[in-house]
Amino acid sequence: MLELNFSQTLGNHCLTINETLPANGITAIFGVSGAGKTSLINAISGLTRPQKGRIVLNGRVLNDAEKGICLSPEKRRVGYVFQDARLFPHYKVRGNLRYGMAKSMVNQFDKLVALLGIEPLLDRLPGSLSGGEKQRVAIGRALLTAPELLLLDEPLASLDIPRKRELLPYLQRLTREINIPMLYVSHSLDEILHLADRVMVLENGQVKAFGALEEVWGSSVMNPWLPKEQQSSILKVTVLEHHPHYAMTALALGDQHLWVNKLDEPLQAALRIRIQASDVSLVLQPPQQTSIRNVLRAKVVNSYDDNGQVEVELEVGGKTLWARISPWARDELAIKPGLWLYAQIKSVSITA
């Protein structure tokens, strides 16, 4: 568990945090440039020193301004992956990985190398590596120090799109197979969508929102970040069944289900899906003989006018689902809070 209760002033920027983060999964730190994202992880890593408050990791005090405690970075057991890989140019990849490696990780070396897909790189110098390869090595080096927490400061920011696509699957594998909590700084919605379990949104050094990805994604805090065509819902589901006759898989959402193209996933596997608001239409009665496979009973929570369109907030199985309709449709259906209706879902995408 990471307890953050501190304030820090750097020049004209003030960062104030009072949050507790669980000791598992990936927490994305999101916000515009200058919001305080890098300042936050620099304070956690010991690269900067808060003027007030405390930082506690798994019961160990890293910072306590009142008591004058400030552990040096090497004593914090915190790994740090920078935007630029910062590998030692005169060491081969193997030497970079072994530099600072904890004794407890010696037996894990081969497994981690395989997990990151860097076996073919071990005898090469950093200068011969692509940007994505360098970042994989940097992540491996950080993990081999046996950290209790891994900090990643926009590790994909300096990569072109093909290299980002190359690295994302490795990061997804890490989240599943390495039981180390991570703080992932990014201003990329796509990266957050594919990697994060939780999101902390920073603005001018203050926390504007913090919680599970699907909750923060559906909140008003994220609206300015999502263009109209990308307004969507993120929902947690589990694999319910595979159709006996068609290449389709049913996903449980509360006591209802959604059909998607067949997935190579076991029953009860937890997944995350994304549904675009523009792919949700509303009807008052369950449709008959329709090609749309997914029709969910839903309750209207609220509706909001948005530049000639209406965003309708729905509750389905205790989760939030957004629909975008016209003012004409709103008036004709008499949309109001508490109304029960049916949401027709045209398309579902799997995000994680």
Curated annotation (Swiss-Prot):
Domain ABC transporter intervals: 1-229
Which EC number(s) are documented for this chain? Answer: 7.3.2.5
* Major subcellular location class: membrane
Please state the span of the N-terminal signal peptide per the UniProt entry.
Answer: none
| CC annotations in GO | plasma membrane
Q: Which residues bind ATP?
A: 31-38
Q: How does it sit in the membrane?
A: Peripheral membrane protein
| Domain Mop residue range list | 289-352
Taxonomically, which superkingdom?
Bacteria
Q: Where in the cell is it found?
A: Cell inner membrane
Subunit comment = The complex is composed of two ATP-binding proteins (ModC), two transmembrane proteins (ModB) and a solute-binding protein (ModA).
Which family is annotated? Belongs to the ABC transporter superfamily. Molybdate importer (TC 3.A.1.8) family.
User: What NCBIfam families does the record point to?
Assistant: modC_ABC, Mop, PRK11144.1
Q: What is this protein called?
A: Molybdenum import ATP-binding protein ModC
Give the originating organism: Escherichia coli O6:K15:H31 (strain 536 / UPEC)
Q: What is the lineage of its organism?
A: Bacteria, Pseudomonadati, Pseudomonadota, Gammaproteobacteria, Enterobacterales
